[in-house]
Amino acid sequence: WAFSLATDYNPNCRILSMPFIGNLATTRLGLDPLAALVAATRNPSTTLDDPDVTGTIVERGRADINILWSESVDGWCQTPGENPVITTIIAGSIVNVNE
């Protein structure tokens, strides 16, 4: 069963931080950091109902990728106050580099 993690930004819940949501999922719900990352990235892409467009890394794929700063998968959600993304690639082109 694939499930998704997301923020629910609204007037009563002003959270925009996916690392914070991942941190809650791992520390409060006991999810493995990799499972939380999949629930925040791959699983939501399945709702687009087009596996050829996004959500997978495959030859001749679209190549929308965020590259994270940590050497371990745990890093993306264990520092919820920091941006874990160092590079963003959309359609194979680098569009953002955080230093």
Where do the PLM segments sit?
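C-terminal cap of metal-dependent C-N hydrolases
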Residues: 42, 46, 59-99
